[in-house]
Amino acid sequence: MDTNEEKLLFRDEVFQIVGCAIEVLNTLGHGIVEKPYENALVVEFGLRKIPFRQQPAFGVLYKGQQVGLFVPDLIAFDSIVVDTKVIGRITDHERGLMLNYLRITGLRVGVILNFEHRKLEWERIVL
C-alpha cells in the first residue's frame, strides 16, 4: 500500500474517534486516571452509534502456541485499536506498543489518545 492510501485508511473513522475523545476531555477535564476516560469513550461511542468492543481478548502466539493474552482498551469500527493514556507525552514507546497491538490483533490502524493535558494529544498509527 502506498503512502497516500495509508493516509486515507479509516481516515473518517479516526476523526470520529478523536471527536469523541475531545468531547470526553472537555467534559471530564484532563489528568485523571485512564479508566474513566476509556469508560467515557464507551458512553460517547454509544451516543454517536460508533460500533465498538471494550476490553476484547486476543491470544499472543509464539510458534503457534498461545503464551498470553493482549486486551486492548477498545476496538472501534471492528478495525481500529484505541488506546487511552494519561502520560506526559506520546513517545516511541507508546508507538512501538501500538505496532505490537496491531500485529497481535491483525488490524491495520490504531489511535493513541493522551488525556494528560488540556488539549488532547493523539496519534494515528498504521501498520
Question: Where are the model-predicted features located?
Answer:
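Conserved catalytic cores of phosphodiester-cleaving nucleases, focusing on short active-site segments
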Residues: 29, 52, 72-90, 101
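Nucleic-acid nuclease catalytic cores
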Residues: 85-127
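A short, glycine/Asx- and small/polar-enriched loop/turn
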Residues: 49, 66-70
